[in-house]
């Protein structure tokens, strides 16, 4: 159970090898819904919020129209998916996804619970986005890998899917559709 607090290394390993299914606990879902509502209330009020309805960097004072917000977020993901080189092992990607889901389950990011549901649905369905080992940007060093992960979640790029014990490459939208998952 992913709750934002009690995830152990043993649980991460079990989920990554498929011996344990991960799901979002109801308390985390409630915290996430409250956090998301706070973001939506701010946006509904017309307030300008950096990175949600503005440009970035030098364009931070440019208000983006409501009809372009989804495109803004997708373009941000695409622009940061700039890794190179060999890809990470799919099991390691599944570990990364499980840990990210746990972090988001704390309920302080304003993200929709459905995004974490998709992350965990991908993990449980053994769908690992293709993430290059080399490269990142920003102070945290995780923007490129997380952007590659998110590319899979929006149905773009390539994923590895475990089929009969072997990892095979598929385009992300096909992998999601075959698993009955909707991209965000």
Label for each model-derived stretch:
Residues 1-184:
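Conserved, well-structured ligand/cofactor-binding cores
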């Amino acid at each position: 159970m992913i709750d934002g607090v009690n995830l152990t290394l043993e649980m991460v390993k079990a989920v990554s090898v498929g011996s344990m299914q991960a799901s979002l606990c109801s308390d985390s879902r409630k915290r996430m819904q409250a956090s998301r509502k706070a973001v939506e209330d701010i946006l509904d009020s017309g307030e300008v919020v950096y990175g949600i309805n503005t440009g970035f960097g030098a364009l931070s004072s440019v208000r983006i129209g409501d009809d372009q917000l989804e495109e803004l977020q997708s373009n941000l993901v695409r622009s940061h998916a700039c890794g190179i080189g060999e890809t990470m092992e799919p099991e390691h990607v599944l570990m990364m996804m499980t840990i990210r889901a746990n972090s988001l389950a704390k309920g302080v990011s304003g993200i929709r619970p459905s995004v974490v549901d998709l992350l965990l649905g991908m993990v449980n369905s053994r769908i690992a986005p293709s993430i290059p080992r080399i490269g990142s940007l920003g102070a945290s060093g995780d923007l490129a890998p997380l952007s590659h992960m998110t590319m899979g979640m929006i149905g773009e790029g390539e994923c590895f899917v475990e089929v009969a014990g072997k990892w095979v490459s598929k385009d992300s939208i096909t992998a999601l559709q075959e698993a009955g998952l909707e991209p965000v």
